[in-house]
Amino acid sequence: MEGTITALYRFTEKGKPGEALKEAYLIKNVGMEGDRHADGGEKQLTLLSGEARGWMQVQETPGLCFKRYKANLEIEGLAVSNLRPGICLQAGTARLTVTECAKECFQGCQLRENGIACRLSSGGIYLKVAESGTVKTGDPILIL
């Protein structure tokens, strides 16, 4: 199964919007070069499906974490519902490993309190860089 990387963002400062990139270098066991989250943890990169992003944009009441979740990679065409921890992805010349699926909802979120199933909770994926490489907008992303 294959999808496409539709957007790349680097976040250099807390609370600031991300910088849209045409390409980025991903460093093995670190994350995206220059990103404030590139610290070698289990959440080196964040991925968001286009479906989840589209759903977020049409909500009358934004979820509590809509502004908090910062996606490094936005994709189309790859069913994120098929992703599980341990699954490997090829993105550009980099290899990624899924470390966590399904972001946990925060207490106090209007969507959660109103019983609305948030697509960010299932469409937000955390990744680790397994092999360094370059990714570009328009590159394919596929499950290995």
What are these regions (language model features)?
Residues 1-144:
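Metal-cofactor-dependent catalytic cores
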